[in-house]
């Protein structure tokens, strides 16, 4: 999963990176973000940045994989859903 860190620059973090850092499944991170987005949008008047990347699948074909690209504020908002250890890992990553 080393390619994940190259998706965005240091000012943003992807849902893929969040999954890797916290040890959670990416689909669970995506679900948490989708569930929290309506409240965020109501207060901040903007949605999270939903992106896609093309990935190769086992049969040699390709498919598009969705992911979110979040700034620090958005990322820390999402982290409120995590357990203490996962949240601490995410905060540590932002300090690096």
Q: Where are the model-predicted features located?
A:
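An anion-engaging/catalytic patch
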Residues: 1-96
């Amino acid at each position: 999963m080393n390619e994940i860190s190259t998706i965005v620059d240091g000012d943003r973090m992807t849902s893929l990176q969040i999954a890797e850092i916290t040890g959670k499944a990416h689909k669970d991170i995506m679900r948490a973000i989708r569930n929290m987005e309506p409240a965020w949008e109501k207060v901040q008047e903007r949605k999270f940045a939903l992106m896609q990347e093309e990935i190769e699948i086992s049969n040699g074909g390709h498919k598009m994989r969705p992911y979110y690209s979040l700034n620090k504020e958005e990322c820390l908002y999402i982290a409120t859903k995590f357990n203490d250890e996962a949240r601490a890992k995410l905060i540590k990553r932002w300090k690096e």
